Amino acid sequence: MKMRDSKGFTLIELLIVVAIIGIIAAIAVPGLLRARMAGNEASAIGSLRAINSAESTFSSSCGANGYAVSLEDLSKAPTGSTQGFISPDLATNGVIKSGYEVNVSSDTSAATITAASKTYNGASAAAVSSYFAEAHPVNVGSTGQRSFGTDTRGTIYFDNTGTAVAAGMSGASVLQ
């Protein structure tokens, strides 16, 4: 019998390496998913802050102290400008951004301030006395866990169930 000089790894050594990689992956993947959800939630909060800012600017410059009732109206540029009040990635109600659906509407107690034809950006709906915006995860537990809402006051609220926050913020808590 002739002995050969073997070079390389044995099957056992390779299996041990694969098992170690599997254990590391099992530990790391849930943390990465939680980090992704936290990032999506931070993006949703940022979107609501951008909406608050856009609504404030719309009200003071274009809506005769009234607020827009849709993202479409916020995305329209005022007379003499080429840019709307909100970034193009938030240009329509129901837009999906970072795993969250974002919407703007009039608040439940909103009254008409000025007709749509009287706004300076050709809004499709009348400017109203108060607005409501919400962002909820498309897939609760996967793209995000909490839902968020805000209104004319500018305070952001959250709900841990992931269901869309209702106008009036019933059942929601103030985000610290």
What are the language-model segments listed below?
Residues 31-48:
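Aliphatic-rich helix starts adjacent to a transmembrane/signal segment
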